[in-house]
Design a protein with these regions (language model features):
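Intracellular juxtamembrane helix-capping segments at the cytosolic ends
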Residues: 174-187
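C-terminal membrane-cytosol helix-exit motif in multi-pass small-molecule transporters
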Residues: 10, 35-54, 237-245
Length: 260
């Protein structure tokens, strides 16, 4: 939700420029505000006290019996992250500007609504997972989202493109809570900390590589290529994930999500 508000605030320089305030000064102030927000987050985290381990809880342990499963998941999640990095929000904003001439203020408003849809979709994810399962939630909400991204790349005008992108936002993040729960469900309790880090680090590294490729495709004039490539790679990831793990049993305690 706050990411959505931050996107909306991206239009402030244009709004302040209309009031006679220098646009460049406003942009510089926003960078300072971004740094101040980061410092505030650090202060808040540093004030959190470490909680003692609960009695009877499994002590964290390195990956053991679940190592092979976690390695396969990490490889698949890395493909997903690499695909997502091809069209990060900054590149998507650039695409909207280059393709349709969308202003900074309008782009901020779009990302605000897209962020709200993404946030609410994550709240709906547990309900969907209770009905169809964690793996099916990850796969069968992600594939339509990727198709909407491809359709946006081929859209004939701005309104169709924004409509497809908003539809994508309503589905694309629904797999996030389901993915975390699924990883925890296929490993032993003692391995959960190691599994979380082992799947997160490769995802971050993969996501760091692809924005430069997406930017290079934009610079070469292939404006739709990063969106289409992202959508196709994500669909390939979803199909590979479903094929590899649809028969894999999961911890029933994890999959029985709280119905309250």
């Amino acid at each position: 939700l706050f990411a959505a508000l931050g996107a909306l605030a991206a239009g402030l320089p244009d709004a302040l420029a209309a009031l006679g305030i220098d646009r460049l000064a406003s942009l510089r102030a926003m960078f300072v505000g971004y740094a101040a927000a980061g410092a505030s987050i650090w202060i808040l985290y540093s004030g959190i006290e470490r909680q003692p381990a609960q009695e009877g809880a499994a002590a964290p342990a390195p990956l053991g019996p679940s190592r092979a499963i976690v390695i396969r998941l990490a490889a698949l999640f890395s493909l997903d992250s690499f695909a997502g990095g091809l069209i990060v929000n900054s590149l998507l904003a650039l695409w909207l500007f280059e393709r349709f001439g969308l202003s900074l203020t309008a782009a901020g408003a779009f990302f605000f609504w897209a962020g709200l849809l993404s946030a609410f979709s994550q709240l709906l994810a547990p309900r969907v997972a209770r009905r169809i399962g964690l793996l099916n939630t990850m796969v069968f909400t992600h594939i339509p989202a990727s198709l909407f991204l491809i359709l946006a790349a081929l859209a004939p005008d701005l309104w169709w493109a924004l409509g497809f992108l908003l539809a994508r936002s309503a589905l694309s993040q629904m797999d996030v809570p389901a993915r975390s729960a699924y990883v925890m469900s296929v490993v032993t309790p003692a391995e959960r900390t190691a599994a979380a880090s082992f799947t997160a680090v490769p995802r971050s590294l993969a996501a760091a590589l692809s924005p430069s490729l997406g930017g290079a495709l934009f610079a070469a004039g292939w404006l739709a290529a990063p969106l289409v490539a992202c959508g196709c790679l994500k669909i390939a990831y979803d199909l590979a994930l479903w094929q590899a793990f649809r028969q894999h049993p999961v911890d029933e305690v994890i999959t029985k999500l709280d119905s309250r």
